[in-house]
């Protein structure tokens, strides 16, 4: 459990740092930083699932700290949900719908790509 907590702390710290940097770099009415972080997290989880878990390269003791702890706290469904509701409240329903559609499509694609990369990795 301590490993999951440590992974969670590191993931939250990484998410905050990257989110702040992306927000300053890419100011927009669309929640692009949240989308980018969630897609990166989906890619990472797909890779870890394929390379680390399915191919047995990640020791059992590291699986939960990396997946549930780090990647789970790095990505965030709640921030994505709030971003979408705020767009709806502001009357920007086309952006809200785009956020939902793009996040779902690109997130699933990122997991798929991550797994494909994992199975091509030769180590």
From Swiss-Prot:
Pfam families: CRCB. Na(+) binds at residues 72, 75. It is found in: Cell membrane. Na(+) is not transported, but it plays an essential structural role and its presence is essential for fluoride channel function. GO terms for molecular function: fluoride channel activity; metal ion binding. InterPro entries: FluC. Belongs to the fluoride channel Fluc/FEX (TC 1.A.43) family. Fluoride-specific ion channel. Important for reducing fluoride concentration in the cell, thus reducing its toxicity. This is Fluoride-specific ion channel FluC 2.
